[in-house]
């Protein structure tokens, strides 16, 4: 479905009492599908303009739109979202990342500057919101929705509020150890020929998908090489997080399942049933969960509301999915994640979370 989005925002004083408005039309511009307005307290014109864009994009996504034409009278927002101008102000950068994350969900989207005379509907909504902001000392007035669709901060059927931090969870490509189905934890094998082909295909898919604000990776070579390949396709740098490393399998490193079971039959059996059990000289799955949660929390704080590519290993990715599902340890033994597969988990500032995708491999 194709839609037209009109958005506007402003402040009285710049900065001053601010608000935004957004409206989503059918492609022929004949019918209003959704509209939003909100007073946002004291802010600048540019912040309010971005907030209006985010509201319009969010409404369009929730309507199921796949294509969008965005019309705004803010030259700055149009040029920045089109990639022709750089975003330098830190307050705008955060909003830009949120807007790009929403825009990435459309198959096709374009931005057009229009004079204010062609943006009167959204301008009226924004002025209504600014009136409300001027009448209230509250910095965050409640959003006023006019039709039965949701604003960016209204609760959906999950009860979550706001824009989530979306984690695209990419498992590294194949290595010689993974090809032989051997335990591969803190050992540092590189990608093999198949692995390099896999990560190239994944990187191409992610570049076409777009909307990714950052790449965070395990420091182990197989994951880091996967991350660098994707980051180059996305024109981004790689940030390394040690808490994303694979489980330390200790003495079982490099062994097959059968070899580890033969070496320590009773311990191996218990390890498969109890996440507190530690392999000889290694770490338990409970230990992995604790550090992965710590790493996840850093990502959420550092990239709040953005889409982040997280490149890691099978166990840390399972742990992130477990956290998003708020599930028990049993889910670890029931999830299958292929090499170079993609999963998606979302985490909201209010503590809500969801899993959007598990083990996508169609691009390979």
Curated annotation (Swiss-Prot):
It catalyses: Endonucleolytic cleavage to 5'-phosphomonoester; adenosylcob(III)alamin 5'-phosphate + H2O = adenosylcob(III)alamin + phosphate; alpha-ribazole 5'-phosphate + H2O = alpha-ribazole + phosphate. The keyword Nuclease applies. Its EC number is 3.1.26.4, 3.1.3.73. The keyword ATP-binding does not apply. SUPFAM superfamilies: Phosphoglycerate mutase-like, Ribonuclease H-like. The active site is at 172 (tele-phosphohistidine intermediate), 246 (proton donor/acceptor). Mg(2+) 1 binds at residues 8, 49, 73. Residues 1-139 form the RNase H type-1 domain. SMART domains: PGAM. The lineage of its organism: Bacteria, Bacillati, Actinomycetota, Actinomycetes, Mycobacteriales. It comes from Mycobacterium tuberculosis (strain ATCC 25618 / H37Rv). This is Bifunctional protein Rv2228c.
């Amino acid at each position: 479905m194709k839609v037209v989005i009109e958005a506007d925002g402003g402040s009285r004083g710049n900065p001053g009492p601010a608000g935004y408005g957004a409206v989503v039309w059918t492609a022929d511009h004949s019918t209003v599908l959704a509209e939003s307005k909100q007073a946002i307290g004291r802010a600048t014109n540019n912040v309010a303009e971005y907030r209006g864009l985010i509201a319009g994009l969010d409404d369009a996504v929730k309507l199921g739109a796949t294509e969008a034409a965005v019309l705004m009278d803010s030259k700055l927002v149009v040029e920045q979202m089109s990639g022709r101008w750089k975003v330098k102000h830190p307050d705008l950068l955060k909003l830009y990342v949120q807007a790009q994350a929403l825009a990435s969900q459309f198959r096709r989207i374009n931005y057009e500057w229009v004079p204010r005379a062609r943006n009167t509907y959204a301008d009226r909504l924004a002025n209504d919101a600014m009136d409300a902001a001027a009448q209230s000392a509250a910095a965050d007035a409640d959003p006023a929705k006019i039709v039965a669709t949701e604003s960016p901060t209204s609760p959906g059927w999950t009860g979550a509020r706001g824009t989530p931090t979306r984690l695209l969870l990419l498992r590294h490509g194949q290595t010689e150890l993974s090809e032989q189905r051997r335990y591969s934890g803190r050992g540092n094998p590189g990608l093999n020929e198949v692995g390099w082909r896999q990560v190239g295909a994944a990187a191409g898919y992610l570049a076409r998908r777009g909307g990714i604000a950052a790449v965070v990776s395990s420091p182990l070579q197989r994951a880091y090489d996967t991350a660098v390949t994707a980051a180059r396709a996305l024109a981004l740098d790689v940030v390394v997080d040690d808490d994303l490393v694979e489980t330390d399998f200790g003495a079982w490193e490099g062994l097959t399942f059968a070899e580890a079971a033969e070496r320590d039959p009773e311990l191996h059996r218990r390890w498969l049933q109890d996440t507190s059990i530690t392999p000889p000289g290694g770490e338990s799955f409970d230990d992995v969960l604790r550090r992965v949660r710590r790493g996840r929390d850093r990502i959420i704080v550092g990239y709040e509301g953005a889409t982040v590519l997280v490149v890691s290993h099978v166990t840390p990715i399972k742990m992130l999915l477990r956290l998003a599902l708020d599930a028990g340890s049993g889910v670890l033994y029931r999830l299958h994640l292929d090499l170079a597969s993609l999963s998606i988990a979302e985490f909201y500032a209010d503590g809500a979370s969801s899993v959007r995708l598990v083990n996508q491999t169609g691009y390979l």
